[in-house]
């Protein structure tokens, strides 16, 4: 079978083959990016599966270790861990493959740019033959018309003068027609030669591209095949282990580990009663009046057997009158063990002390007081929220914690001030002044959650002073006030430390985080927001949405691309549903929201919201960066927003801003060039625009395009193509285009033309402004994903739009 070549199949009457082949080459970049996205998605799935298997393996360790089946859980755990490692190895291989695809994509872009320069001559030849074809067709029609006119005059018997004029016109049309035929022949030869070479070049590029893509796919399939072979080996090993785990071996292990001994009870013979022994055996039992309740039952069970010694029955020492003797112990031991503790006497010959015990009955007058106390106790218990069991501390540890608490109270702490060195654009009031914290004591009983950035303990703000001096309006400078969150009462004998000066009124840094409570012990909260009620539980994954918004600012100077100035910035906003606020407030330690920013190689600078977002500056990955949020600060901020707008169904929080590295005019999605021709009576204007898909990660449609051009000089009339609107009050011409993409006419290239009649000319060339936007895409290629559990990403919205997009002549 003979392969169909590009040289043979891309000609046609309209000579559009070059355009089709060129765009096919550009689609190769899209296929490369989509292949990288596919492999990345597969790696994400494998990573999630590996984590789930690891979690399952850990849960197998928590299953019951009692019974004969217990050793089987070790087999399950080992097999599951190996399966998790297999999938984790596949993730590593896929990540290496993604880097290879991205590297190939970068080389592909460079190759396509070089090819574009090489085939520029072919593009000119295509345009030339299209123009000469149109001119030839018109000259042919003119020639036929003149010939027909001459023949008509001859047949109608026109005057010789008219016939002579018609003959002159016919001869002139004939010469023009022949001239265009000759030009067409020369242009056709040049076009065929260049088009043949270019078509072959495009075919070579496509063959190389497909070969490389197939090699990448082969590497992908081999990696998956190797992992599946390893998984098969793990399953075989599991089958063999289960085959070796016989019922006999399980029963034998249980008997060896849990066996109680091989000696069976001996025979007991009847013995005659010895009165002396019987009296001594009865005497200790009469002295058990104040012994422990559990011991009495043991002695009743043992009465059918010979009386064992006192030590084996754990009977306390009694005096001659039958009272239990309280063992001697120091104060700490007494507090630790209460009356259950026993201490050995230094001398067995020492005479024990005697204690007289007196039980006082309840006085009748205290009955009502007792009932009232019981009622108060029931009310108190009803208001208590159960928390997870807290491990007991020894008195030494409690004393140490108390010392630390007193030391912390004496030394107020403050968070370091962090400011961005370079501001991108005007920051939101949320990013106002630097974060400063007031002094706050650390509670000794609370501990920070392991997953939160708070490592010392619960930060409790001091109580609000009776009178707070108000800051001047100049210091606030448009910064929205964030209220101080609710502070738990401080149970301390010492007075609270004074409030440190704040950079802002009610600084959001004074945020309290309560002690770590398990989410499992917190009741589910039913939340209703608007027409669609949402039931959110603390164990459910909470939905959040993320918006990536980028702004491209550009200044074009004439038609010189080297004078173009470009600046691209971006914002990341997280949207929380209104129902999540009750979940946060009902759980003192909500799950930390962590997110990862990917594809950051093109970013020059990232500025997180220092009051709400933390990051690790030591991260070494140049293409990703992880962030996590201060959940207490987020809760306070969301509560503030809900108070300002209670009816809102969701609340937006700006988390970070970034700046994208630009490459001049190549980073602008719409290239501009303006031309002015000004005279005393008229002004001619032309604006050339060109769609630039190379500025975007994936070419997308530019919509809502608006062009505004101010023209002075007293405009009396305007003629424009395409039609524009003239605003006489503002002295501006206004164009509005529906959309531009690479599928538009001429690949998204075009011109705006206008002619203005003036009464007070000449005009002065002015700066024009352009606006447009694009949904579902970004210029930087930045992407975001959630890391960890507790939250799910319900929506990711991407868009970019113009900021200050200006052009001068």
Swiss-Prot record:
One of its GO terms (cellular component) is presynapse. Residues 87-156 form a coiled coil. It holds the Pfam family muHD. Residues 541-808 form the MHD domain. Residues 3-250 form the F-BAR domain. SMART domains: FCH (SM00055). Residues 390-416 have a biased composition (Polar residues). The modification Phosphoserine is found at residues 312, 387, 394, 402-403, 487, 492, 495, 507, 509-510, 532. The modification Phosphothreonine is found at residue 385. Ubiquitinated. Mainly undergoes monoubiquitination but also polyubiquitination. Residues 301-352, 390-422, 435-536 are annotated as: Disordered. GO terms for molecular function: identical protein binding; phosphatidylinositol binding; phosphatidylinositol-4,5-bisphosphate binding; phosphatidylserine binding. Residues 435-456, 501-520 have a biased composition (Low complexity). SUPFAM superfamilies: BAR/IMD domain-like. Homodimer; disulfide-linked. May form homotetramer. Interacts with AP2A1. Interacts with EPS15, EPS15R, ITSN1 and ITSN2; recruit those scaffolding proteins which in turn may interact with the adaptor protein complex AP-2 at the plasma membrane. Interacts with DAB2 (via DPF motifs); mediates LDL receptor/LDLR endocytosis. Functions in an early step of clathrin-mediated endocytosis. Has both a membrane binding/bending activity and the ability to recruit proteins essential to the formation of functional clathrin-coated pits. Has a lipid-binding activity with a preference for membranes enriched in phosphatidylserine and phosphoinositides (Pi(4,5) biphosphate) like the plasma membrane. Its membrane-bending activity might be important for the subsequent action of clathrin and adaptors in the formation of clathrin-coated vesicles. This is F-BAR domain only protein 2.
